[in-house]
Amino acid sequence: MKKIIFMGTPSYATCILKALVENENFKLVALFTQPDKAVGRKQILTPSDTKAFLSQNYPSIPIFTPSSLKDENIIREIKDLNPDFIVVAAYGKILPKAILDLAPCVNLHASLLPKYRGASPIQSAILNKDEKSGVCTMLMEEGLDTGAVLESLECDIKDKNSSEVFELLANLAAKLILSTLLNFDKIIPKKQEESLATLCRKIKKEDGLINLQNARELYQKYLAFTPWPGVFLENGLKFLELELVDELKQNARMGEILELEKESFLLACKQGVLRIKKLQESGKKALDGRTYLNGKRLKSEDSLC
């Protein structure tokens, strides 16, 4: 039975953690995750998704929430646990060389490396209109997502939002980590092709700001930034649910309401047309498209804003 230290934080990581802890070939000896965070208006201290899952279902397994992995006491603790593997999935911290040298460190990255190294591989794939994505296991080294690839699985992501792709890739990753660890000695690591590498940065709230220039680009942003940070106009109006109707139409005014439907409306962009199904003004409740227009006394051929 191989001893595993798992390092991960969000629900994507929990899916992988669950697969490992339930498999009889592995013994989870510790979880490392981000410290509890203050959440919401009341700033309630909330544990990470992985910590909540493990403490509720496997309370005897130790959980560590260090602010830094460079702490000598933490490094000694990991060394004393004597893991056969350290598995990392969306942990949120860089592993120092002192830890990388203790055991094979296997990272599960939510892209087909070397494409989309960095913090937002799923959102970046959607923004770039990729129809395929996937997940891979990688031997970690000091560089950011630069290690040799062990195995990968591919899937279709066309017209899926970030939330859906996260769930899809988490389930793939849970299968993949079992395969990689069980077959580790037989797998020949494949060095990444540096000339094909692309980088992606962390998503910020302001990335959700949109204009009505291009319907296709707005739609891809909507998919990429669901559920967070969402998409919103400069005046704070959020588009919560929308569909791409036409990506080429150009014979209407930008922002013109083209047609009212039962619970939605068609909106002209400079190029293309969107169906707006649900939207929300800042500080107000969400409304379906038709109800929102009725409340504003807006009709066909009027401008939305």
From Swiss-Prot:
**Encoded by which gene?**
fmt
Residues annotated for (6S)-5,6,7,8-tetrahydrofolate binding in this entry: S111, L112, L113, P114
Keyword list (alphabetical) reads:
Protein biosynthesis, Transferase
Q: Which NCBIfam families match?
A: fmt
The record's listing under Gene3D superfamilies reads:
3.40.50.12230
GO cellular component terms, semicolon-separated: cytosol
Q: Fetch the CDD domains from UniProt.
A: FMT_core_Met-tRNA-FMT_N, Met_tRNA_FMT_C
Q: Which family does it belong to?
A: Belongs to the Fmt family.
Q: What is this protein called?
A: Methionyl-tRNA formyltransferase
The organism encoding this protein is: Campylobacter jejuni subsp. jejuni serotype O:6 (strain 81116 / NCTC 11828)
The record's EC number reads 2.1.2.9
Role according to the record: Attaches a formyl group to the free amino group of methionyl-tRNA(fMet). The formyl group appears to play a dual role in the initiator identity of N-formylmethionyl-tRNA by promoting its recognition by IF2 and preventing the misappropriation of this tRNA by the elongation apparatus.
List, in alphabetical order, the Gene Ontology terms for molecular function in this entry. methionyl-tRNA formyltransferase activity
Catalysed reaction(s)? Answer: L-methionyl-tRNA(fMet) + (6R)-10-formyltetrahydrofolate = N-formyl-L-methionyl-tRNA(fMet) + (6S)-5,6,7,8-tetrahydrofolate + H(+)
